[in-house]
Curated annotation (Swiss-Prot):
Top-level EC class as recorded in UniProt: hydrolase
The protein's required cofactors: Zn(2+)
An example Gene Ontology CC term for this record: plasma membrane
Origin superkingdom: Bacteria
Record-level GO BP terms: proteolysis
Pfam families: Peptidase_M48
Predominant localisation class: membrane
Residues the record lists as binding Zn(2+): 143, 147, 226
Name of this chain's protein: Protease HtpX homolog
This protein's encoding gene: htpX
Subcellular location, record wording: Cell membrane
Length: 298
């Protein structure tokens, strides 16, 4: 059951990424049709913009991410218990030892960052280290180590970059149309050409809806990677109860004291900001109740 769940989560992520690239291609083709009278040119430009965004974000410095989240690096002497658990989980996962950071915050939370296992880091709040026992900490750190081993940070970064690219292309296309960039096409099409009018309307609709759809796909990818990391943590620790108990404590945690931006919020094991009341479709994290239920059903 454990390996089946891991496999299903990976497959869902692949499907979502394929849909994401298809959406980027669609928005590029639509913008190309409306502004350049050339589907192919718009499609190529969209993919190039997407790749530039993804590449620039993937190689963002680990130290910069930690600095943005008020995390300070610690040595084995400063936090031996935490350090050794990270070391043990990294050894079991067969990845290099990540750098270890602590965030001075009473809330219960942790996250990992780094585009590859070779430049990864793990951070935990002081609240988490104080409240959780060893088996619960192993579950949490196993979750973060799994994000590193599964290249989740890279996948999530690509998703954020693609969502940003879709939004930028849609915004540029909309502004150019508003200021007359599409007037030539509107004159050439003619009211009697029904097919062209339908194509024009569909292209406009895709420009309007693409940013929302892109955001929903990005958030869905983030939620799937959380489920995968939970299951992968159990694979590393061989102790589902440790992860379940940790999630039960995380469920009761207060929001973090310092502000957390959207990109950083998706990295944490638990939503670091005040819980929102709207649909889970717009959440970076699946409900903890569902995460616990999945672990119990393994």
């Amino acid at each position: 059951m454990l390996y089946q769940q891991i496999s299903q989560n990976k497959q869902r992520t692949v499907v979502l990424l394929v849909v994401f690239f298809a959406l980027l291609a669609l928005i590029g083709a639509s913008a190309g049709y409306l502004l350049l009278d050339n589907y192919a040119m718009g499609l190529v430009l969209a993919l190039v913009i997407g790749m530039i965004y993804a590449t620039s974000m993937i190689f963002q410095s680990t130290s910069l991410v930690m600095s943005m989240n008020n995390a300070r690096e610690v040595t084995e002497k400063e936090a031996p218990g935490f350090f050794h658990i990270v070391e043990d989980m990294a050894m079991v996962a067969q990845i290099p030892m990540p750098r270890v950071f602590i965030i001075e915050d009473p809330s219960l939370n942790a996250f990992a960052t780094g585009s590859s296992p070779q430049n990864a880091a793990v951070a935990a709040t002081t609240g988490l280290l104080e409240v959780m026992n060893r088996e619960e900490l192993e579950g949490v750190i196993g979750h973060e180590i799994s994000h590193i081993r599964n290249y989740d940070i890279r996948i999530s970064t690509i998703a954020v970059a693609l969502a940003s690219a879709v939004t930028v292309i849609s915004s540029i296309g909309g502004r150019m149309l508003w200021y007359g960039g599409g007037s030539r096409r509107q004159r050439d099409d003619g009211d009697d050409d029904v097919l062209r009018i339908i194509t024009l309307l569909l292209s406009l609709l895709s420009l309007l809806l693409a940013p929302l759809v892109a955001s929903l796909i990005q958030l869905a990818i983030s939620r799937q990677r959380e489920y995968l990391a939970d299951a992968s943590s159990v694979e590393l620790t061989r102790n589902p109860q440790g992860m379940i108990k940790a999630l039960e404590k995380l469920q009761l945690s207060q929001p973090m004291k310092h502000p957390v931006d959207d990109a950083s919020a998706a990295l944490y094991i638990n939503e670091p900001r005040k819980k929102r009341s709207f649909s889970s479709l717009f959440s970076t994290h699946p409900p903890i109740e569902e995460r616990i239920e999945r672990l119990k059903n393994m």
